[in-house]
Amino acid sequence: MSENHDAVVYNTNAENGGGCPVAHRRAPHPTQGGGNRGWWPNRLNLKILAKNPAVANPLGGEFTYAEAFRTLDLAAVKQDIAAVLTTSQAWWPADYGHYGPFIIRMAWHSAGTYRISDGRGGAGAGQLRFAPLNSWPDNANLDKARRLLWPVKKKYGQKISWADLMILAGNVALESMGFETFGFAGGRVDVWEPDEDVYWGPETTWLDDERYTGDRELENPLAAVQMGLIYVNPEGPNGNPDPIAAARDIRETFRRMAMNDEETVALIAGGHTFGKTHGAANPDEHVGPEPEGAPIEEQGFGWTSTFGTGRGGDTITSGLEGAWTNTPVSWDNSFFEILFSYEWELTKSPAGANQWKPKDGAGAGTVPDAHDAAKSHAPTMLTTDLALRFDPIYEPISRRFLENPSAFADAFARAWFKLTHRDLGPVARYLGPEVPTETLLWQDPLPAVAHELIDAADVATLKGQILASGLSVSQLVSTAWASASTFRGGDKRGGANGARIRLEPQRGWEVNEPDQLAAVLRTLTRIQEVFNAAQTGGKQVSLADLIVLAGGVAVEQAAANAGFDVEVPFAPGRTDASQEQTDVESFAVLEPTADGFRNYLGKGHRLPAEYLLLDRANQLTLSAPELTVLVGGLRVLGANYQQSPLGVFTATPGSLTNDFFVNLLELGTTWKTTSEDANTFEGRDAATGKVRWTGSRADLVFGSNSELRALAEVYASDDAREKFVHDFVAAWVKVMNLDRFDLV
């Protein structure tokens, strides 16, 4: 198969190369990021399955952030943050004497990378501290915002993570300027390295937009319109100052970040109620490199400006210049009042950026200067602000907020909370005294456990009933896997808890084989109903627990078929969500369009199947050995989509053997592609030409990729049969419990 997916761009040093970038290029030293990827840019990057290793964590394995956070005096932290906000520093003076708007921007940009398609991005790990986010053009000068908070972080140390502190500081900033927030939850755990598993786009130049095709169709899973922007271009699409065209970009981008039209209007208007933009001069002429490209003496700072003092009134950030309102450090309804009070005309900032001012000199002198009390200005609007007035969908929402300030305040409070907490996961992960009591649909709510849990004797009884039900190992394993493997490590959504596999939209997903799924669920539901009806003391079993238990029963049976007596650990405590607690549109983005664990490959993928398998393993937070053992086990258990024979390298399906690895690595097999797209292959006996096996790319990669082959060789060894069973059980239980935050 020709590797028609996008190649990884590899930067080489062509200095002293006689002007020829090919014959004389010089590969980087390993400390500069050199290595095998330079020679083979399309090789699988298994390092994304070894994120944040324990040896990189300076806090050690005994440290538990949740326990440390619970000892924190949150009110005292907020007081200290509030003091920072109103103590202007000479090295980076506060606009209007208040850092609140600056800190809000930092919190917003920390959270604003989240996208619904894959659940990656967001504030949950404090990635704004690291490349590439710390050096995106849209994050210019936010390095200073984080430094302003260092005294607070230093004081409280490991009791509050940077990830939590940045979001908490955003809340305090809002509150200090008169706004009542919806609440705050801690629980974001810092990591110690950049995310290397997030696809930010195909571009290799800042602010390029190769992510579009056709009629401005944005590539999935991306949300931002250009490389290095959080959302949209404030000047309009590619700098075109067209509010209607900008509205289209806004709507698509915010939708991909889980926001509806009302939330979008509230967020833009609420954020632009505060502060100003900064464009004192042309950044191309005066601004130095971003933090990751700055010299060592800058000590992590970037964007050093040579214009004037480089700060205060001489600050250059976006290139846009001006404030939206005449009360830029107070919460009020002035954004909408000003937006609708004036007619607007296009103008240029001192840096040459497109922005808007009131026509005919209206509004002059109504907006205070950020640093000089003797100066005043007219208000400024951006092209994206005018979209809220002129787009036919946004306009009535904006007018309603203009006429109902309390509705606007409530909408902004809720949207801000959603923005800053969307990737934190379910409420079970929320920490602190300011967690809201109201349940919100986007939190994927679950009912509380309101019954006595089953005990070991009950588990034994239910296991017997499951074994006697007539359901096969394949059916039980497939159903449990389908239920649990929706989990996404990025935003902690999905998983088996809630038994949402029986609800829309999951019960209708193609990969879940709806007809077979319905039959299995009917049988398990009957077992559940009979068991629950027989209880007299309030004991119950949820269908969510029963699905997982049934999968474990099947694994135990398959192990027994292979000659091994194992017990699959099981922890009851899951509950069953209702359809009313399940937002169909929100859950639709969790649908797998490829699942190499089930040898399922939908249509329209840019990447080959083995890359999609790796991505799914990453979402499931699996290591490379766990990925390997799960694929090998699921193949021999018959968990393939539509019972496909692909990768079922065994004569005894339903037995938990290491046959997948033994037969894949058999030296007498020759593999040839059987499809034009090179997704399926036949393995023939090299001597007779007889077809032995058929396999997919998600199978053959374990013999092709050198790292995966090394792992496959472990499990194919004669002394690994028992190890394989135990390792499979451990990895299986991990997946079944990924969303059991109560067990952590």
Curated annotation (Swiss-Prot):
Task: Tell me the residue numbers annotated for binding heme b.
Answer: H272
Q: What does the PTM comment of the record read?
A: Formation of the three residue Trp-Tyr-Met cross-link is important for the catalase, but not the peroxidase activity of the enzyme.
Record-linked PROSITE patterns = PEROXIDASE_1 (PS00435), PEROXIDASE_2 (PS00436), PEROXIDASE_4 (PS50873)
Report residues of the Tryptophyl-tyrosyl-methioninium (Trp-Tyr) (with M-257) crosslink.
W108-Y231
Q: Please give the Pfam families that the UniProt record associates with this protein.
A: peroxidase
Annotated GO biological processes are:
cellular response to hydrogen peroxide; hydrogen peroxide catabolic process
GO CC terms: cytosol
Active site residues according to the UniProt entry? H109
Database matches in HAMAP family: Catal_peroxid
Q: Which family does it belong to?
A: Belongs to the peroxidase family. Peroxidase/catalase subfamily.
According to UniProt, the name of this protein is Catalase-peroxidase
Species in which this protein is naturally found: Frankia casuarinae (strain DSM 45818 / CECT 9043 / HFP020203 / CcI3)
Give the classification, highest ranks.
Bacteria, Bacillati, Actinomycetota, Actinomycetes, Frankiales
